[in-house]
Amino acid sequence: MEQINNFYSTILKSSHPFLLSIHLGGKAVPLIFYVLGSLFMGFTAQFISVVLLLAFDFYITKNISGRKLVQLRWWYDTTGKQSSSFTFESYKQFSPGPSINPIDSKLFWWSIYLTPIVWIVFGIMCILRLKLFYFLLVSVGICLTGINAYGFRSCDKWEPNANEDSNNSWFQLPTIPGLDNLNALSQVQSFFQSRSG
């Protein structure tokens, strides 16, 4: 009981205790529904519930809690007009404002990195137990939490004054020669999007 009181007092020391609670709850609730959902609902209902909870967590983390708790924001550029596909917004590019609360930062980063690891462990367990349909559900969890972790890590390492080549130098996807047509396809898609909008 003392650990719960200590955790509660830690949350209260946050700059945004309600938002931090929603952020941590958004990480925990899909995991709880995955572990305990089969006790009180069928697989289809559990699958849909967990995917919707993961999507809610992805949206809240990417657009609200990341912006408020650690002053970072990222999005993926789908227009194909930029050479870098990720666009970042960071406290580093603006004049100094309110400082980042260390409790907010610590709990945010721990939850961002720990959640994909937990989903990966669940994925390994699904493979070992040959539960392929549950593995599909876990794969959604790995993808959504992993993309958020990747985006926020890239945003945190991003330097606004550095050239574009050094922004993504810690991890780059390989260039595959046969996939040059994807660039042309994205240009055609952006052409039609600009005409319709």
Swiss-Prot record:
Provide the primary localization.
Answer: Golgi
> Pfam families under this entry?
DUF846 (PF05832)
| Gene Ontology BP term (one) | protein secretion
Q: Which domain of life is it from?
A: Eukaryota
**What transmembrane ranges does the database entry give?**
15-35, 36-56, 107-127, 132-152
State which residues carry a glycan (glycosylated). 63, 167
InterPro entries xrefs: TVP23-like (IPR008564)
Localization: Golgi apparatus membrane
UniProt keyword list: Glycoprotein, Golgi apparatus, Membrane, Transmembrane, Transmembrane helix
- What topology does it adopt in the membrane? Multi-pass membrane protein
Give the protein's biological function: Golgi membrane protein involved in vesicular trafficking.
Name of the molecule in the record: Golgi apparatus membrane protein TVP23
Species of origin: Vanderwaltozyma polyspora (strain ATCC 22028 / DSM 70294 / BCRC 21397 / CBS 2163 / NBRC 10782 / NRRL Y-8283 / UCD 57-17) (Kluyveromyces polysporus)
UniProt lists the gene as: TVP23
